[in-house]
Structure formats: structure tokens, C-alpha cells
Amino acid sequence: MAGLSGRTVRDLRRESRGAVLQRLYFDGPMSRRALVPATGLSSGSVSNVVAELLADGLVEEAGSVGSEAGRPRRLLRIRPGSGCLVGVDVGETRVRVELFDLGLRELARAERPLGPRGYDVDAVVGHVHEGVAEVLGAGARAAGELLGVGIGVPGIIERTEGQGAVVHGQTIGWDAVPLERLLRRPGTGQLPPGLPPEVPYFIDNGAKSLGQAEMWFGAGRGARNAVVVLFGSGVGACVVTEEAAQGRAVEWGHLTVRVGGRRCRCGARGCLEAYAGAEALVARWREAGGRPSDGADEETALTELLAAARPADGRASDPVAAAVLAETAEYLGAGLSDLINLFQPERLLIGGWAGLQLGGAFLDRVREHALAQAMRFPAGRVGIELGLLGPDAVTVGAAVLPLAAFFARGGHRPRPATRPAPSPAWRAALDGRLV
């Protein structure tokens, strides 16, 4: 029965279960008594919900703690083995697939290089299918335990009624790619063989996935407003505010920093990414006379640039490499100052493989430029730091997508998709006559 708000008893029950699960997940182990103020539920509701979750195998007891009355209170926590999650990072050089338990402990991983076909859609779909099957086998987890597959991809994600998540990835040559539909077997709407049909895909922007991971488990935890920057071959950002708790991806890398400037991968000129992305950074070093090793990939070339600019053995710095890094710090600082002025975050975090590889010394110079160019008030209250989760942050963030949906369902497993009932024979006959 629905109340005035339109919510049914089942809805309220699901929300109560979700509230208890989330508090135990982020703040557990906790006692039943501590859950009452933490969730805003009555003690009776907490007791009933906990009893259900224990019976479902989602929660387990984890010792006890003393109380003023002398009787110990039993502590509760999420049972990590009660389900598993897959996170996928469709990155710039490879597709990385990781299997996690509910506590986000890594159980297995698989990687597939993108190779000469690059972002060929069929190749990427095949890599995801193979990777999911591989990690489930390596982690010795049954497909029925899987709560969902989260995928972080470059580009703008459009949610559509008929095809699910559609990816608009201009810089990688994806124009309205119906990725969610392609990940399922054509014509059936089912997942690849071996996975139950009810296992859902959750597809989102890679920078947003990175941001979600840092906000839940990394350097952004506890902040109400933050911007998390992904610095790899290209650059992107995720903006998290109190009004948009899940965060939203912004195409920050395609902010124009020089009118009529360098050609960007997106086709425009003068984008920030054309100056500050790792691909552009290495290209500018080559143009200035730098010499990365023959056949070096992007990550290796960036490592060599850093070694030339900041030699570890006491040799003199290569002035060409040092000048390219200094100019890049200035461009990135200008881009960050725009984010500070626009969104006025408490924290501005830099992640992505290139951002982490460039490290703290480079960040100091970027921070100096950003704070010098931003408005004084927002600049005075923002902290600019490196992210904490390392190169796996996108896969962790992608796995958070099915985890968040699991909480929203109150800990219930995904249900099989309902198929429409077949049309009666008279309808088929009538349709045939009307053609």
C-alpha cells in the first residue's frame, strides 16, 4: 500500500535495509545501539532489519564491546564474501578488469592491451567479455555471486531507453556507440554465456569513476565539495557537490586555453588536453628536441622525460625536458584555477597514471600557478593534493557503481529482466492483415 508520498511499505523496508548496510559498510563494525542514531531509524526497526540481514547472510557478528550497563554489545559488519563485483577500466593503453569482494578487496585481475586496433569497439567488447570470464575463474567465484559489472570509459555517457548507455567519445573515435547493448548478445538482451541474465552493466565516464573512488575511499573522503582530476593521455574531471552527491563528469580537458592553438585529439584547437595531457606532453618534448627511446610507449616516454628533467644521479637537468615540464605545470595550473573559480571546492585532487607519475614535486609547481591565478577567496580555502588510490582508482570506482546499486536495492540481488508477454494470436493475425 502506498502512502501520501507514493512510497510503499516495501520501499520503506528497502530504504531501511540500505541505510543499515551503508552505515556498516563505511563506519562498521557497529553495535545495534550505535546504528540507531547513525541511520535515524528506531531501535525496533534496526533490530528487525539486522535480523533480516543476518538471515540473508549479508551481515555477520564481529566481536563485542563493553557498555555502561556491563552487558557487552555485539558488533556487526558487512560479510565480504556475500557477493562480488567487477570493475573495468577501458583505459588509454589497455582494458583492465578486476574482481572484488564486497569489501573491495581485490580477488583477481586481467589485462588486455588495446594494441594496434586501439579503441576498435568490437575489440573492446571482446576484451571486457574475456576479462570478466577470466577473473571469475581465477577468483573461484560463481557467476551467480556477481552483483554487477561497472565500466569506466572515456567520453560522455547518454542514458537511453532502448539501448542503455551510449558513449559519445569524440577523442577515441566513438560516435554514439551503444556500448551497453553491444556488451550483451545481439538480439537477445542477455549477457555473454556463463553470466546470469540479471547481472547488470553499469557504464560511466572514467573520470567520474575515479572521482567516486576517491570520494568514498581516498583523499576526498569527508569532503562536501571536491573536484577530482584525471590526468592521463588526456585530462578530465569529476565534480562532486552537496547537490550532486554522485558527482558529474565534466570535459575539462577541452577547455580552450589558447585560441587557434595546437590541434587536439577531439578535432578542435587550443584545448587544455592538447598542452597538458601526457600524449601532448611527450609530443611537445619530441618537437623541442627530446629523444625518448625508439618504440617507447607513452608511459615509458613520460618516465624518460621525468628522468631527463630531474636526474636522480645528480647530473645536470636537461633544459629542454625541464622547460616542457615547466610550461605544462603552467597550463595545468591555469586549468585548475578555472575549476577553483567555477566550483569553489574544498579539495582538488589529482589522479590518473600520469598525474601520479609526475608526483609531488611537479604538483607543487602546478599548485603555485593555480593559486596565483584563482580568485583569492576560493583559492584560500581549497586544498590541492594527489589522490590516494593509485593507478587502480578507475577500476575501484567502476566497481563502486554496482555496489551503490546494491545498497539502493537494500541488499537484494538483481532480478531477472522481465520479458514482455507474447502478443495473442488474434493480434498477430490482425497486424498481418493491416500491412
Please name every model-derived segment.
Residues G206, G232, A398:
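Active-site glycine-centered loops adjacent to acidic/histidine catalytic or metal-binding residues
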Residues K208, V235, I350:
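AAA+ ATPase active-site-proximal loops
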